[in-house]
């Protein structure tokens, strides 16, 4: 294949696609250049069907530091595990691609996106999503695309497609929307309390832009696309399926309708175990035993899938007996834990999350060093999903992609209502521990996070609640479900999470298993979600009406002082010696920013006060006409040097010791004496002159007489302008 180049202009930037030059051994590959961002995407497929009961799709997004002209940090000076942002981008690409493969497709597929050059104003994430779809579409992999995605901003009442970095900083919306030419199939968003109408309009504007990108892809596929490979799909034996359905469908239907989760799972598993045992015995010696038992498991899964959907669409009955727009029983509690800075426990049916707040000095903020310039991250929301929350055993270790994604969703939802750094100069960390799960645990973590923030005294602008919406669709008719549980999520067509305040939406996330959904479904889902959100907010506000006016006793207190920028080095000292000494002496934590704002943190107010005194002393400046209680530290013939405070000395000239003539400095003061002085002059070099006599009553002038007019009178000599420190 020879190199071919395709060009267009999209959202004000040139979009260039190159095929046939690099990574030619992959099933499909493309280089996408958007602005000055360059992404190489390669897609490959295994030769045979995988043995698992799921589609093994892997999407990677690799950030190479050289792409931004940056040298890797760390000991190895090499890229390591993917950053959080890279992991989230990989998920963002995976989600719209996954529904576009045929039911029963089980070959392993890998899509690897490598960022080769980085332009912060031309999204490499969207270039990678475009490249992923294109590489699959032009390959022989049986992909039913194409799809595409765009970012949408909202600035001054206008929607912007793929906004620049500067536009993102002032945007009220951070939305990624992806889909096919016919419908939206993935949404990820954070927003500053925008209305449902604005969000819906943004989604539709984004989809219009997606259609442009898909049309461009279709041109490229028509020019260089390969013929799709014939692959084996997972099909069950139809005779076996009919036999099992006839014999056991009624038993499974009864089991599915058990309302309580654990009891329902036990009932359905009992039916499955019974069927499995029958067919294991029946085909024990059959040469295709493994295939038959795989078919049995798949048939039972399909039967349960069909019954759950039939109940909802035909009987309008959910597995736990709720109405389609009904929320499970709610409960909320604050101060669940002692000693911590804030805690909230939120329960919705059999889904329960505990959120724990920790406040820290700004020096504890996370430093993020990726392709963007290094920055500090003030707020973190971490989500943990232990296997015991669903009554199972499983792996323990570092958080997986799902946990990272759910944590990021909660972070977006809550960060919109956090106070500014000026209002609340703390680093903030929330940790959500999922204690029970039967669906919508990410939204429970948002509700619990709101409780923890308010209980901990963080002055958030408004409480935030989240709800997960579902969808069951048969192509012609559909049913939107409020507050989906695990079974409805597993067998449903959509997981649409909506979080926000009473004023508007702060976060959205949508994943679907069908090829797309319409504006009508989106509108209905948003309206039902708003009603449910308000119901949850009623509970939160009844539990804790407003953020507490004070922090927890165990939380670090803070005090701030402002110093001149040129004094920062004095407080820090050589190699940090001075500031380290203050910290060691007082036990506080100290942060100093480049503008001279000094923040002092401690749970002990006395320690804060002591540190403030020390710092104030270090940066204190003498002022003309101010009086100081000083100590004599050195004596010279022309005067005495006194220490005003800390490292600031002043010269009291011999003529400023007293109103009477002084011939010998030591006749008036000795080293170690404590005296009151007034500053009378500070020169351009910062040298200070002080006076003792200025604080003493001036003696009356002597009576005039002829002899006093003698030119050689000593008073005449004394009245000559005295020498100062700067003239010595």
From Swiss-Prot:
UniProt main location, coarse: cytoplasm
GO biological process terms held by the UniProt record: mRNA catabolic process; RNA processing
Ranges for region Disordered: 691-728
Subcellular location field: Cytoplasm
EC number in record: 2.7.7.8
Record's catalysed reaction(s): RNA(n+1) + phosphate = RNA(n) + a ribonucleoside 5'-diphosphate
Enzyme class: transferase
A UniProt-annotated Pfam family: RNase_PH
InterPro entries assigned: ExoRNase_PH_dom1, ExoRNase_PH_dom2, ExoRNase_PH_dom2_sf, KH_dom, KH_dom_type_1, KH_dom_type_1_sf, NA-bd_OB-fold, PNPase
Cofactor or coenzyme needed: Mg(2+)
Binding site residues for Mg(2+): 489, 495
Keywords: Cytoplasm, Magnesium, Metal-binding, Nucleotidyltransferase, RNA-binding, Transferase
Regions of compositional bias (Basic and acidic residues) in chain numbering: 700-709
Domain S1 motif: 625-693
The keyword Transferase belongs to this UniProt entry's keyword annotation: yes
KH domain span: 556-615
Entry GO terms, CC: cytosol
GO molecular function, one term: RNA binding
Biological role stated in the UniProt entry: Involved in mRNA degradation. Catalyzes the phosphorolysis of single-stranded polyribonucleotides processively in the 3'- to 5'-direction.
UniProt cross-references to PANTHER family, sorted A to Z: POLYRIBONUCLEOTIDE NUCLEOTIDYLTRANSFERASE, POLYRIBONUCLEOTIDE NUCLEOTIDYLTRANSFERASE 1, MITOCHONDRIAL
The protein's name in its UniProt record: Polyribonucleotide nucleotidyltransferase
Organism: Streptococcus gordonii (strain Challis / ATCC 35105 / BCRC 15272 / CH1 / DL1 / V288)
Organism ancestry: Bacteria, Bacillati, Bacillota, Bacilli, Lactobacillales
């Amino acid at each position: 294949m020879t190199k071919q180049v395709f060009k267009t202009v999209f959202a004000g930037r040139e979009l260039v696609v190159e095929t046939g030059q690099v990574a030619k051994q992959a099933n499909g590959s493309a280089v996408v250049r958007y602005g000055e961002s360059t992404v190489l995407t390669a897609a490959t497929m295994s030769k045979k069907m995988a043995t698992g009961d799921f589609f093994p799709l892997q999407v990677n997004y690799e950030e190479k530091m050289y792409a931004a002209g940056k040298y890797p940090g760390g000991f190895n000076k090499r890229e390591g595990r993917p950053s959080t942002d890279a992991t989230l981008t990989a998920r963002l690409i995976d989600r719209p691609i996954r529904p576009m493969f045929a039911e029963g497709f089980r070959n392993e597929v890998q899509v690897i996106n490598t960022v080769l050059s980085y332009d912060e104003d031309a999204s490499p994430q969207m270039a990678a999503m475009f490249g992923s779809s294109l590489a699959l579409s032009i390959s022989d992999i049986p992909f039913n695309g194409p799809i595409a995605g765009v970012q949408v901003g909202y600035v001054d009442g206008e929607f912007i497609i793929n906004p620049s970095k500067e536009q993102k900083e002032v945007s009220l919306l951070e939305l990624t929307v992806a889909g096919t030419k016919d419908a939206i199939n993935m949404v990820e968003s954070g927003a500053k309390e925008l209305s449902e109408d604005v969000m819906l309009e943004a989604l539709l504007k984004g989809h219009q832009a997606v259609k442009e990108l898909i049309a461009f892809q279709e041109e490229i596929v028509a020019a260089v696309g390969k013929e799709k490979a014939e692959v084996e799909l997972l099909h069950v034996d139809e005779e076996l399926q009919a036999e099992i359905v006839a014999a056991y469908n009624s038993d499974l239907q009864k089991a599915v309708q058990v309302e309580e989760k654990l009891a329902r799972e036990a009932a359905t598993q009992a039916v499955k175990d019974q069927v499995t045992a029958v067919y294991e015995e029946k085909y024990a010696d059959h040469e295709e035993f493994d295939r038959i038992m795989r078919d049995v498991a798949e048939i039972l899964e399909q039967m349960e899938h069909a019954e759950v959907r039939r109940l909802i669409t035909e009987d309008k009955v959910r597995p736990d007996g709720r109405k389609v727009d009904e929320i499970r029983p709610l409960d909320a509690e604050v101060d669940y834990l002692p000693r911590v800075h804030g805690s909230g426990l939120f329960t919705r049916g059999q889904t329960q999350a505990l959120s724990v707040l920790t406040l820290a000095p700004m020096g504890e903020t996370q430093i993020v060093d990726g392709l963007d310039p290094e920055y500090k991250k003030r707020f973190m929301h971490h989500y943990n999903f232990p296997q015991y929350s669903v009554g199972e055993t499983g792996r323990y270790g570092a958080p997986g992609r799902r946990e990272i994604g759910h944590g990021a969703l909660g972070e977006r939802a809550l960060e919109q209502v956090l106070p500014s750094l000026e209002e609340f100069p703390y680093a903030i960390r929330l940790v959500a521990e999922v204690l029970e799960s039967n669906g919508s645990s990410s939204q429970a973590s948002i509700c619990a996070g709101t409780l923890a923030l308010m209980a901990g005294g963080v002055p958030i602008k408004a409480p935030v609640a989240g709800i997960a919406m579902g969808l069951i669709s048969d192509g012609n008719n559909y049913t939107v479900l409020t507050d989906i549980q695990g079974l409805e999520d597993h067998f449903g067509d959509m997981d649409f999470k909506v979080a926000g305040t009473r004023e508007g939406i702060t976060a959205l996330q949508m994943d679907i298993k069908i090829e797309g959904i319409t504006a009508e479904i989106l509108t209905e889902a948003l309206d039902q979600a708003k009603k449910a959100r308000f119901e949850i907010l009623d509970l939160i506000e009844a539990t804790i009406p407003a953020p507490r006016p004070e922090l927890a006793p165990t939380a670090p207190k803070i005090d701030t002082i402002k110093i001149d920028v040129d004094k920062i080095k004095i407080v820090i000292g050589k190699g940090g010696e001075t500031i380290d000494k203050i910290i060691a002496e007082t036990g506080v934590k100290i942060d100093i920013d480049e503008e001279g704002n000094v923040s002092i943190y401690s749970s002990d107010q006395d320690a804060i006060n002591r540190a403030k005194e020390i710092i104030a002393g270090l940066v204190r400046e003498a002022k003309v006409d101010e009086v100081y209680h000083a100590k004599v530290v050195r004596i010279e013939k022309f005067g005495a040097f006194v220490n005003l405070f800390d490292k600031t000395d002043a010269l009291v000239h011999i003529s400023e010791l007293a109103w009477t003539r002084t011939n010998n400095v030591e006749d008036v003061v000795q080293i170690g004496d404590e005296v009151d002085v007034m500053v009378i002059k500070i020169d351009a070099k910062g040298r200070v002159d002080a006076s003792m006599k200025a604080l003493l009553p001036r003696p009356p002038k002597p009576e005039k007489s002829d002899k006093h007019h003698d030119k050689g009178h000593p008073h005449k000599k004394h009245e000559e302008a005295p020498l100062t420190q700067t003239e010595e």
